[in-house]
Regions:
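Short loop/turn segments at beta-alpha junctions that line or gate ligand-sensing/allosteric surfaces
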Residues: 88
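Charged, low-complexity intrinsically disordered terminal segments
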Residues: 1-82, 91-103, 108-252
Length: 252
């Protein structure tokens, strides 16, 4: 488990740095604060290496944080980066606002993913500011080929990505503010290497994990509408099959 916020940021930076083909990021909240810019900078650096980057963000953050923001516009304007917003806020349809994307994970290539409760903001990544949230993430590494849960997560992402509820976020005009923001994010990456020198080292991913027999991911329906409680049913079924259960949740 990743329990430390600085370690959580370093894992993201290292995973993105080592990506050769693809980076997938899903998050509920993404801010253009210090931690958010760190991740943006890493994504842009990866895109410049011809890594295909896809980012999906919930519509509330899309409305409050991304709308017209020059840093997100810079990110979306970068070649090899695609950005979508799940269920964008529509003030004419307030009844749709309860359908939110709370998924928070990072996938790189076909070898690893990080999944948990951390948003992409100062509250969850690094030690920026006076307040930090306490959260946990699980890191999964597939030693040889794709693991079953990695395939499951990638398939889940593709379904969410292709939903009609997931709308493309585009840079409509590359203004001076956008170009200056892009330059700032590009120049930020060498500073990250100095701030977090561990990402320059070789990581033994296998040594950082514990072998498991199986990892299974559960989810509710993904459409932006009222949903059947599939998760509740699945958890109840699992609780009936074992002698011991451990549940870790930030919400109760």
């Amino acid at each position: 488990y990743i329990t430390d916020n600085t370690e959580a940021l370093e894992y993201r930076l290292k995973m993105i740095r080592e990506a050769k083909e693809e980076v997938i990021v899903s998050t509920f909240d993404f801010n253009a604060d210090t931690g958010g810019k760190d991740v943006m900078s890493a994504l842009i650096e990866a895109a410049h290496r011809n890594v295909h980057v896809r980012l999906i963000v919930d519509g509330i953050s899309g409305f409050l944080d991304m709308l017209g923001d020059p840093y997100f516009q810079a990110l979306a304007s970068t070649e090899n980066i695609e950005v979508k917003v799940y269920n964008p806020v529509n003030l004419l349809k307030p009844w749709t606002m309860q359908a939110r994307l709370h998924d928070k994970y990072v996938i790189t290539d076909s070898s690893m993913y990080l999944l948990g409760g951390r948003n992409t903001t100062n509250l969850f990544l690094g030690v920026y500011g006076k307040h930090q949230n306490i959260d946990k993430e699980i890191f999964i590494y597939a030693k040889e080929g794709e693991s079953a849960s990695l395939k499951q997560l990638k398939a889940y992402f593709e379904r969410v990505w292709e939903l009609s509820d997931s709308k493309e976020y585009r840079c409509k005009k590359k203004t001076d503010r956008v170009q200056n923001s892009l330059k700032e994010l590009e120049e930020r990456y060498p500073k990250l290497e100095a701030l977090y020198p561990d990402i320059l080292k070789t990581w033994d991913w296998e040594a950082r994990t514990v072998e498991t027999a199986k990892v299974t991911l559960l989810s509710n329906p993904i459409e932006a509408k009222n949903k059947e409680p599939h998760m509740w049913y699945s958890v109840n079924q699992l609780l009936q099959t074992g002698k011991n259960a451990v549940i870790c949740t930030p919400y109760i």
